[in-house]
């Protein structure tokens, strides 16, 4: 069945008009046709779309004005006998099920894909009164939070004054004597921890419209795979699955049965075949079940949830004024959120799916404008999204597809309270996709609370494991030897390829960057204290190769997707082995090889034992000095697997503005 838009506006429904749903009895799994009968003219016209029906279906159906009656279809323009019959059920406008009304929307997934098999979510039409979920979806504007005077201040400082009990309401918060400071204490304005005590209005989930979320149509070639074929395919690609009724993996893009607009985007991107996480993750996500995905960075996780999300959007009713997004993707950092949005914009353009990125450190105005205009996909960091929800700029009542990307990192950064508040605003029957690179106990515990009967797919091992295509070189040196060794490495390695250098502190990151530029190296630095405009500039310069050396703290360790990073240098060893895995994972992406150098000092000795295990598992040569350190440090135990808290707010360093003196040739 094909649909086309109507140039003229749809007729206004009246209470005395009759609505009808026609079901092709010869093909009971095809979509139902919604029509509208004008009582005056007797003509049938759709409210939102002009249907081009099957030649064997009637263009005009005889409608009894009372109950539903089967009627035989007559061909519109010939006397040949019909091969199809249609059962017609009629209801008055006031009794029409709003779930069935969505089939008049030309953007409906099944309207656009008549080749789909499988019954709709609701097997038959019913009057609204007979369906407990049939209350029409009419989202109201978010109720403004009205705390008592001086109850909350995002950061201490100036702002709207409150009463004597606190620092006022608003971003600044001034007013009477209040909590103030970062975690309370003297001063003016509320403390930042006041965010945790603020509760968003509790939504009412008693009346929910059912929605469609199972879009998977198994390809005949996939159906034909035997259990032995499936096991062999998974074993060759190191895929482990858990769960009930796990779908078979798809080996080629065509086997996923994506709509044409997704296939066009895939073809234009030049991908050859799905990555392991995509081959198994796509069928899981398209089936509409909750899922857990555990895979290394650079394994193609973003498209694993993004393409099914685009299909999900296409199957839902259109956004109305005041609606929030349909797909919500939470990410831990600004950089990762921006990169996801770039992919969403690229692939969503083929289906005219709108998306926006909501993150801190950037002006709120453009983000608020996008939300008020209406977008189907929102990619956000938890803190800024809560700001938008508090301000009533958006709501999450339409969210039916939730993605938590790099959940382990979000927990490490202390976002668990914000995540819980956000999830509490989303309908409980949503589809949730939970992505992580590791599977510590805290991540598993949160997944148990948010997911229902999930699939689980693991690429490789859930334990700490480095990418085998990366050569890891550990150099045991002292602190004062680091910079001379870095200069020597750059002299040996620099040929115009991209080199990423990681530091533990923002201060050292800027300090070494200044020294590198003074020594003639084209280096730029990026970390959490940089303004967003400067961070965007640094990333653009690094990606383009104009400044092929980038110094960074762990703000760029996750989600940074830059092609052809030749080498990663850990100037400082991170505070967790998880961060070590993710740092070196910036090179060797998408099957390419890479090299990672790490400066390891005596102060890092507590990580030596577990680091040796990681190296041996990846088939790397272990430095004898590191092995000796691991033996002597055995009494100290393994490394700490929990990372530090979030950094503070400092001043811009100006390290990127230092002129490069006597640029070195390479």
UniProtKB/Swiss-Prot annotation:
Pfam families documented for this protein: DEAD, Helicase_C
Instruction: Pinpoint motif Q motif by residue range.
Output: 251-279
The sequence motif named DEAD box is recorded at 405-408
Catalysed reactions, semicolon-separated:
ATP + H2O = ADP + phosphate + H(+)
| Low complexity: bias regions | 64-76
Helicase ATP-binding domain boundaries: 282-457
Disordered as annotated region, ranges: 53-102, 632-666
Q: Per UniProt, where does ATP bind?
A: 295-302
Biological processes, Gene Ontology terms? nuclear-transcribed mRNA catabolic process, nonsense-mediated decay; rRNA processing
Basic and acidic residues: which segments have biased composition? 80-92
Physiological role: ATP-dependent RNA helicase involved nonsense-mediated mRNA decay and ribosome biogenesis through rRNA processing.
Can you tell me which family this protein belongs to?
Belongs to the DEAD box helicase family. DDX5/DBP2 subfamily.
Species name: Oryza sativa subsp. japonica
Q: Which UniProt keywords apply?
A: ATP-binding, Helicase, Hydrolase, Nonsense-mediated mRNA decay, Nucleotide-binding, Nucleus, Ribosome biogenesis, RNA-binding, rRNA processing
Q: Where is the composition biased (Gly residues)?
A: 636-651
Instruction: List residues of the Helicase C-terminal domain.
Output: 485-630
Q: What is this protein called?
A: DEAD-box ATP-dependent RNA helicase 30
PANTHER family this protein is in? Answer: ATP-DEPENDENT RNA HELICASE DBP3 (PTHR47958)
| Location of this chain's protein in the cell | Nucleus
- A GO CC term? nucleus
GO MF annotations, alphabetized: ATP binding; ATP hydrolysis activity; mRNA binding; RNA helicase activity
Query: What does the entry's domain section say?
Result: The Q motif is unique to and characteristic of the DEAD box family of RNA helicases and controls ATP binding and hydrolysis.
């Amino acid at each position: 069945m094909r649909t086309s838009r109507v140039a003229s506006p749809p007729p206004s429904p009246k209470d005395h008009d009759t609505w009808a749903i026609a079901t092709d009895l010869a093909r009971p799994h095809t979509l139902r046709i919604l029509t509208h009968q004008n009582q005056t003219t007797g003509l049938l016209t759709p409210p939102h779309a002009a249907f081009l029906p099957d030649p064997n279906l009637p263009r005009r159906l005889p409608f009894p004005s009372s109950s539903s009656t089967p009627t035989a279809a007559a061909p519109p323009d010939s006397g040949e006998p019909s091969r199809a019959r249609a059962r017609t059920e009629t209801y008055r406008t006031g009794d029409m099920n709003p779930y069935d009304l969505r089939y008049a929307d030309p953007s409906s997934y099944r309207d656009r894909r008549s080749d789909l098999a499988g019954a709709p979510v609701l097997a038959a039409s019913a009057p609204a009164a007979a369906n407990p979920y049939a209350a029409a979806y009419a989202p109201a504007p978010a109720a403004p939070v009205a705390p008592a005077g001086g109850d909350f201040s995002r950061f201490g400082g100036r702002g709207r004054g409150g009463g004597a009990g606190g620092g006022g309401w608003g971003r600044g918060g001034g007013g009477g004597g209040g909590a103030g400071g970062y975690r309370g204490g003297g001063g003016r304005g509320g403390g930042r921890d006041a965010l945790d005590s603020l509760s968003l209005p509790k939504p009412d989930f008693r009346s929910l419209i059912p929605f469609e979320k199972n879009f998977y149509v198994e390809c005949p070639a996939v159906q034909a795979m035997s259990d032995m074929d499936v096991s062999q395919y998974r074993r060759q690609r190191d895929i482990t699955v858990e769960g009930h009724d796990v779908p078979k993996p798809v080996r080629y893009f065509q086997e996923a049965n994506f709509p044409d607009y997704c296939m066009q985007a895939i073809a234009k991107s030049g991908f050859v075949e799905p990555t392991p996480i995509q081959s198994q993750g796509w069928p899981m996500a398209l089936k509409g079940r909750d899922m857990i995905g555990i895979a290394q960075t650079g394994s193609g996780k973003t498209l694993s949830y993004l393409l099914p999300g685009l299909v999900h959007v296409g199957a839902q009713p259109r956004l109305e004024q005041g609606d929030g997004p349909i797909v919500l993707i939470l990410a831990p950092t600004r950089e990762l959120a921006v990169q996801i949005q770039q992919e969403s914009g690229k692939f969503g353009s083929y289906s005219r799916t709108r998306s926006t990125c909501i993150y801190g450190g950037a002006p709120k105005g453009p983000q608020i404008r996008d939300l008020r205009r209406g977008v189907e996909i929102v990619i956000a960091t938890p803190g800024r999204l809560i700001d938008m929800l508090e301000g009533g700029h958006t709501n999450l009542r339409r969210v039916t597809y939730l993605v938590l990307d790099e959940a382990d990192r979000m927990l490490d950064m202390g976002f668990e309270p914000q995540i819980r508040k956000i999830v509490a605003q989303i309908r409980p029957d949503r589809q949730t996709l939970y992505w992580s690179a590791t599977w510590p106990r805290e991540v598993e515990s949160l997944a148990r609370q948010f997911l229902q009967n999930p699939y689980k797919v693991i690429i490789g091992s859930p334990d700490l494991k480095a990418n085998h295509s990366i050569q890891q070189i550990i150099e045991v040196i002292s602190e004062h030897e680091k910079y001379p060794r870095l200069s020597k490495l750059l002299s040996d390695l620099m040929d115009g390829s991209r080199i990423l250098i990681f530091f533990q502190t923002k201060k050292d990151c800027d300090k070494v960057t200044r020294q590198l530029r003074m020594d003639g190296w084209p280096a730029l630095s990026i970390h959490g204290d940089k303004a967003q405009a400067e961070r965007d500039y640094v990333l653009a310069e690094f990606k383009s190769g104009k400044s092929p050396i980038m110094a960074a703290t762990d703000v760029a360790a996750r989600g940074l997707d830059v092609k052809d990073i030749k080498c990663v240098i850990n100037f400082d060893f991170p505070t967790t082995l998880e961060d070590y895995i993710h740092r070196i994972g910036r090179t060797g992406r998408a099957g390419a090889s890479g090299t990672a150098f790490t400066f390891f000092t005596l102060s890092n000795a507590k990580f030596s034992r577990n680091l040796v295990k990681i190296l041996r598992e990846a088939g790397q040569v272990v430095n004898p000095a590191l092995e000796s350190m691991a033996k002597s440090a055995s009494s100290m135990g393994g490394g700490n697997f929990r990372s530090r808290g979030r950094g503070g707010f400092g001043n811009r360093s100006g390290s990127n503005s230092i002129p490069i003196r006597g640029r070195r040739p390479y």
